[in-house]
C-alpha cells in the first residue's frame, strides 16, 4: 500500500479574528477547530496548515485530527481555554461558535474537527 503524501491546507481568519491567529502564532493556542465540512475532512495528521489573516501567514503542522459529533463531546476532551485562550466558559465558547454565520447548522450537520498543532 502506498503511503499518503502529506498535504497543505489553507485556513483563513477574518481580520476581526486576528487575536485567535495571534494566539496560534505565539503558541498559546494549540488546538484549531473547524466545522467538519468536506473541505476540512481532508486534513490529516502530518499535513501542514497555512493559517492566513489578511497578509499575514504562518505554517503549523497537524499533530492529530479528531472529529466530534457535537460541541459537548468536543468540550469533554478540550477545555474552552485550550481552543481559545481567555474565553473562560463553555457557554462563552458555544456563543462564539454560534456567532459565525451558518456555523451552528454546519456543526449540527457535519460535527466539528479539532486539529492539534505542533
For the regions a language model picked out, list residue spans one by one:
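Contiguous surface segments at macromolecular interaction interfaces
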Residues: 75-118
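A generic structural signal for residues embedded in beta-strands
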Residues: 32, 51-52
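Compositionally biased, charged N-terminal/linker segments
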Residues: 1-43
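Ordered hydrophobic segments in well-structured contexts
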Residues: 10-12, 59, 112-116
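Catalytic phosphate/metal-binding cores of nucleic-acid and nucleotide-processing enzymes, i.e., regions
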Residues: 22, 35, 39-40, 59-61, ...
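Short, solvent-exposed beta-strand-terminating loops
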Residues: 68-75
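Short beta-strand-centered aromatic/proline hotspots
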Residues: 57-67
Amino acid at each position: 500500500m502506498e503511503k499518503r503524501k502529506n498535504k497543505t491546507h489553507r485556513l483563513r481568519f477574518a481580520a476581526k479574528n486576528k487575536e485567535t491567529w495571534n494566539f496560534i502564532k505565539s503558541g498559546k493556542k494549540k488546538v484549531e477547530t473547524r466545522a467538519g465540512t468536506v473541505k476540512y475532512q481532508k486534513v490529516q495528521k502530518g499535513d501542514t496548515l497555512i493559517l492566513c489573516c489578511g497578509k499575514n501567514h504562518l505554517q503549523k503542522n497537524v499533530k492529530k485530527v479528531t472529529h466530534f459529533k457535537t460541541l459537548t463531546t468536543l468540550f469533554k476532551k478540550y477545555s474552552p481555554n485550550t481552543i481559545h485562550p481567555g474565553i473562560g466558559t463553555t457557554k462563552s465558547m458555544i456563543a462564539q461558535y454560534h456567532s459565525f454565520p451558518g456555523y451552528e447548522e454546519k456543526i449540527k450537520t457535519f460535527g466539528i474537527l479539532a486539529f492539534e498543532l505542533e
